[in-house]
Amino acid sequence: MAGSLSEIKDKILSTEKTSKITSAMQMVSSAKLVKSEQAARDFQVYASKIRQITTNLLKSDLVSGSDNPMLASRPVKKTGYIVITSDKGLVGGYNSKILKAMMDTITDYHTENDDYAIISIGSVGSDFFKARGMNVSFELRGLEDQPSFDQVGKIIAQAVEMYKNELFDELYVCYNHHVNSLTSQVRMQQMLPIKELDADEASEDRVITGFELEPNREVILEQLLPQYTESLIYGAIIDAKTAEHAAGMTAMQTATDNAKNVINDLTIQYNRARQAAITQEITEIVAGANALE
């Protein structure tokens, strides 16, 4: 019985240590989430303005008939996917949702590796795709908790350049959209060619009229459209990082709660075993005393 009590006590101490670790990790993820949510709000100021400028310009007569490749649809022979995952685990179902969505998409729409190209952001996704022999053109590992544009700008620009050079004919970003601390949604968002423009961004009183573009519209579009697309992709990365921190916080909170439940169950077992041991000792003492009479 003494051995059993000792084993239960060791399990309680071990679980308490685990609970302290997961609780600390929960607090770290919570702090990262607050920073990421603020970064997302700050970025939206810039993103909203460039969306408004681009939408107004494209809905005006100033650029009608442009043959800019970022606006023109072409027969789709190959599709590019930017897939955003985390660099490590302990984030619940964050990665599994994205990877499942990508595998379903590839199974449904592509029969050969040459039909698609993956640009992977995050070690989990890179390792997953490479282990299955899938077509990973570029990858970025070790993304910061609050990634700057300088860190991701090169791979974003590379994706846009690959589209412009017709290495693929459409570009999507697959990521987890942050809804709140408990919820995220998988998004498969088309970035190129530029098709869907938010009508709310171009109200009648904001549409550009009576302006001239210098030196000419094609030069303006050549500068503006990549910047517009890159801002959307960067926004998706910030959004995904926010969802990752929320998932990490929730996962560690769940782990902490589970550890506390285990501790409670073990404590009950310990008390019962201790009570049984004491009862047995009393019984043995009484039996011994009776034997001496």
Curated annotation (Swiss-Prot):
Q: How does it sit in the membrane?
A: Peripheral membrane protein
- GO CC list: plasma membrane; proton-transporting ATP synthase complex
InterPro entries attached here?
A: ATP_synth_F1_ATPase_gsu, ATP_synth_F1_gsu, ATP_synth_F1_gsu_CS
Compartments where found = Cell membrane
**Keyword 4Fe-4S attached:** no
Q: Which UniProt keywords apply?
A: ATP synthesis, Cell membrane, CF(1), Hydrogen ion transport, Ion transport, Membrane, Transport
Record CDD domains: F1-ATPase_gamma
Kindly list the biological process annotations in GO that this record carries: proton motive force-driven plasma membrane ATP synthesis
The molecular function GO annotations come to:
ATP binding; proton-transporting ATP synthase activity, rotational mechanism
This protein's major location comes to: membrane
Cystine pairs annotated here are: none
Please provide an example of a Pfam family that matches this protein in its UniProt record. Answer: ATP-synt
Keyword Membrane in the entry? The reply is: yes
> Highest taxon of the source?
Bacteria
Q: How does it assemble?
A: F-type ATPases have 2 components, CF(1) - the catalytic core - and CF(0) - the membrane proton channel. CF(1) has five subunits: alpha(3), beta(3), gamma(1), delta(1), epsilon(1). CF(0) has three main subunits: a, b and c.
The UniProt function text for this chain reads: Produces ATP from ADP in the presence of a proton gradient across the membrane. The gamma chain is believed to be important in regulating ATPase activity and the flow of protons through the CF(0) complex.
Q: Which family does it belong to?
A: Belongs to the ATPase gamma chain family.
Checking NCBIfam families in the record gives: ATPsyn_F1gamma, PRK05621.2-1
Its recorded name reads ATP synthase gamma chain
| Organism lineage | Bacteria, Bacillati, Bacillota, Bacilli, Lactobacillales
User: What gene name is given for the protein in this entry?
Assistant: atpG
